[in-house]
Amino acid sequence: MKIYFKKNYLPSMDVDTAVVLQVEKYENSFGLEAVDPKGVAKKSFLRENFKGVFGTQVKLLYPEGSPVACLQVMGLGKQEEINDQTFLKTGGLCFPQLNKANKVVVFADALGIENQTSQVMHFALGLLLRSYSFKHYHTQKTKNEKNLEITFITENAELCQKEFDDVKAILGGVNLTKELVNEPANILGTNEFVERTQQLQTLGVEVEVLNKETLEKLGMNALLGVAQGSQRPPYLVVMKWLGGNENEKPVAFVGKGVVFDTGGISLKPSNKMEDMKGDMAGAATVVGLMHALAARKAKVNVLGVIGLVENMPGSNAQRPGDIVTSMSGQTIEVINTDAEGRLVLADALWYCKTKLQPKMIIDLATLTGAIVVALGYEYAGLFSNNKELVKQLVHSGEVTEEKVWQFPLGPEYDRLVDGKFADISNCPVGYGAGSITAAQFLKRFVGDDIPWAHIDIAGVASGKKKNEFNSSWASGFGVRLLNHLVKDYYENK
């Protein structure tokens, strides 16, 4: 797909489809007269009772000799309620209507509202996000949407062209995350995941890979224990984007990367086990974020740390009741081998905090089914030891439509993770609050001396999280959220 920005529409552009944006109850639409000089559209509005309500649309086909063959009118909703997210969603809703088009013109400056470059950028992003599909393994190929040419007509064309590079960077990060999560586990194991991270080096990201021998020397027995039952080797991958000042401490993002999770000896039910190929979505989000930041040359120092393992049953697999000593020196009683993500993160978080010494850490993981029970598929769970970081994440979530909801942490929950035969239990039984106790477990490896947040994305990373601008099984959730967080609160600071 090719995107262009022009200040004026010319009939010589030879487009076959035009898209016009309609503010609710507003009489006119920018560009409508240019492509519909005979006023056919307004007559159709009356017949269809189209008033420009958000999410509604009218599609008109024109006879040969008309300026365009097809006109798509998209409702933006009420004037006072329109924002960047309105344009993001409208762009996503628009894309399926363009499946037969070749050259499209979008009149992006809606009449009745103050037009801003960010609105055009969000429309373009929504359209591009919706265009993603994962069909690598289908043998019957459909039309290649990449041949589509779209020209946005806007007063801010020159500025839009400059800012579009950032949109492409974010899009690349989101789509990379989707690709990683959508890939089947027989294609994307730990070795292959490492190779994907190393491709970030072309963007200027430094990539360090810690293999099994190195992890053993570091004492990462919590992470290593999860990998015991699999023939695939474990890794810790450290990615660095150093776009800020030389002496500036980095911000860090840590991701759970279980490339397939059978549950181990505590075997999962067979129903929907195939979805466990997506249990590395936290790591995939971190990789996608690093891509986005590097591609847009973010002026900030950022670390991405991911623990890569496969959780399989086998004669050498970790057993319920095993006790392991983590890199921190704290001992962990493994009550449930299917509570493995927190074991991986325990060592990854400790390594990140003590060896890399960032000024802030955020971890992401498809950690608990309990978060889905609590929040469903609309919000990710947020846990933190820092009120300011919570405010930043909540705001970024609202702005990007990747929303987070804060849960409590505290001593009354912390004591629930005390172990019977070791310092900590990886799965407290009979207390409820499964997502909270999982977060309290992680907090044992971070403490209170560094701002930290844990985002449980089990309900939003894949499966049910489809919306106006995403039709993929994998949602790519978190890349736009964290990119906004970095840009607004940590870049150029």
Swiss-Prot record:
It holds the Pfam family Peptidase_M17_N. HAMAP family: Cytosol_peptidase_M17 (MF_00181). GO terms for cellular component: cytoplasm. Keywords: Aminopeptidase, Cytoplasm, Hydrolase, Manganese, Metal-binding, Protease. Mn(2+) 1 binds at D261, D338, E340. It is found in: Cytoplasm. Belongs to the peptidase M17 family. The active site is at K268, R342. Binds 2 manganese ions per subunit. Its EC number is 3.4.11.1, 3.4.11.10. It catalyses: Release of an N-terminal amino acid, Xaa-|-Yaa-, in which Xaa is preferably Leu, but may be other amino acids including Pro although not Arg or Lys, and Yaa may be Pro. Amino acid amides and methyl esters are also readily hydrolyzed, but rates on arylamides are exceedingly low; Release of an N-terminal amino acid, preferentially leucine, but not glutamic or aspartic acids. Presumably involved in the processing and regular turnover of intracellular proteins. Catalyzes the removal of unsubstituted N-terminal amino acids from various peptides. Mn(2+) 2 binds at K256, D261, D279, E340. The keyword Cytoplasm applies. Coiled coil: none annotated. GO terms for biological process: proteolysis. It comes from the Bacteria. Its cofactor is Mn(2+). This is Probable cytosol aminopeptidase. GO terms for molecular function: manganese ion binding; metalloaminopeptidase activity.
